[in-house]
Amino acid sequence: MSLNLEDKKAVVAEIAAQVATAQTIVVAEYRGIEVSSMTKLRAKAREQGVYLRVLKNTLARRAVADTPFAGLADQMVGPLVYGISEDPVAAAKVLNDFAKVDNKIVIKAGSYDGKVLGTAEVAELASIPSRDELLSKLLFVMQAPVSGMARVLAAVAEKKGEGEAVAA
């Protein structure tokens, strides 16, 4: 289905708005993928806050022009799905995890912090824990000494309570 000029401008504006707030873009080839698989991928992306879209490459090139992601333009060839996220690792994680399950999704490239990433670098980025995971680990590490101290104090209080009960 071809788009008229106004529709194309609207698509470019929508993508440019997503790109303006994004930290990461991941580009994956999707030849021969079944509709049910693409639906699962879209649902997973939505859960993780990743904007996932199949676009005409010329429209995608226009949307990323004059942004830190402009270096990806050379990689925009063939049938591609674009994962765009504000979280530095979410798009890479969603597409990389799905590519492990469905071999019809092939990661081509990505861009983070103005640098174009290859397939191996996108996989590395996907292996990094998300910000929320890191914060929960940090909180656990900070709480561990406090909860340990609380258990020790409770055990001491319990022991003193037993000692007083025996003396009475």
Swiss-Prot record:
Forms part of the ribosomal stalk, playing a central role in the interaction of the ribosome with GTP-bound translation factors. The gene is rplJ. GO terms for cellular component: ribonucleoprotein complex; ribosome. It comes from the Bacteria. Gene3D superfamilies: 3.30.70.1730, 6.10.250.290. CDD domains: Ribosomal_L10. The keyword Ligase does not apply. It comes from Laribacter hongkongensis (strain HLHK9). NCBIfam families: PRK00099.1-1. Part of the ribosomal stalk of the 50S ribosomal subunit. The N-terminus interacts with L11 and the large rRNA to form the base of the stalk. The C-terminus forms an elongated spine to which L12 dimers bind in a sequential fashion forming a multimeric L10(L12)X complex. GO terms for biological process: translation. This is Large ribosomal subunit protein uL10. One of its GO terms (molecular function) is large ribosomal subunit rRNA binding. Belongs to the universal ribosomal protein uL10 family. It holds the Pfam family Ribosomal_L10. Keywords: Ribonucleoprotein, Ribosomal protein, RNA-binding, rRNA-binding.
